[in-house]
Every structure is written in structure tokens, then in C-alpha cells.
């Protein structure tokens, strides 16, 4: 009973203290909500698994999905085939998925996961087709992460963070949301 009260209390806190509004197209999606947000992408420089420095704020002109994940997160692993398909579908239209590992297991674990993991994709096996950067919970919070994995932030062509994704969202909903951003 105490646990139920605690969950209700936390939920009420986030409901009444949220700076976000629910996206009407995603609010009925049983897989998870997409919320509106409006903040400029802060200057953030992260290192990729191939030791390149990537300044996220220099990606204006691109629509980006900053996907926060960890190797131990089942939802993160489950949604990866959808992200691979979305990257394939929209990469030639100025869109990219950028995975940001906030894994407490370290860079070696993340690198092994990315290099050795094959994802089932339409009856075949496929590797990741988007960059993976090393981050931390603190960096993710600076970028709009509120906690809970999987999670993501959609950034428009002007470098504004416009949507936050909490939990696993259906591929169809995410595709529709990205398509709208690409058309604006």
C-alpha cells in the first residue's frame, strides 16, 4: 500500500511540475509519451567510440534524435531495430540518430556491445548504422534527459530541442513525428 502511495505521489509531482505538454498524436500511444519542449541545444562535446570529438551544437541544419541508452536496458535493446530502420529511411533527408551511452559499465562494455551485437531486422541481421557517443547521466540531463531508459530528445534543424521521448515509443509514432520535423 505504501509503495502505491509513493508511486502516485511521484506521478503527481511530475504531472504538476512538468514544463512539458503532451503531444496529442502520441498521448494515446500505449507504448509511451512524446512531450513538447522548447530549448536551445546546449553546446555539448562528446567522444565517439572511434575517439572522435563530436560537438552536437554544430549540427544545425540536421534533425537529430539524441537517444540515451545503456547496454543493460532491455527497452533500449528492443527499440534498436526500429531506430536502425528510421535511420535508413531518413538519413538522406537530413536526419540522424545519435546514440548517447549513459552506461555505468564503461566504454569497453559499450564498445563491445556495439561491435558484437547484431539486431534482427526484417528477417536479417544488422549492425548499428548510426554513431554512438559516450556520455553520462549529468550530460544527458543537460540535454533534457529526465531519467528512465530508453529516452530521447528530438532536435530540429534550428538546433532547438523540440520533443522529449520517455520510454519505448512505437516506430510508427516516432516516424510520423520525425517526418513532421523534416517537413518544417
Give the location of each predicted region.
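Thiol-/selenol-based redox modules, centered on thioredoxin-like
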Residues: 148-184
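Short, internal strand/loop/helix patches
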Residues: 114-157
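Residue-level recognition of beta-strand->loop/alpha-helix junctions
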Residues: 101-103, 134
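N-terminal targeting signals for export/organelle localization
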Residues: 1-43, 163-164, 184
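A short beta-strand-turn-helix
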Residues: 43-64, 87-90
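Short pre-active-site segment immediately N-terminal to redox-active cysteine/selenocysteine motifs
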Residues: 62-64, 68-72, 148
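Conserved redox-active cysteine motifs that mediate thiol-disulfide chemistry
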Residues: 68-85
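Hydrophobic beta-strand anchors of alpha/beta hydrolase catalytic cores
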Residues: 65-66, 97, 152
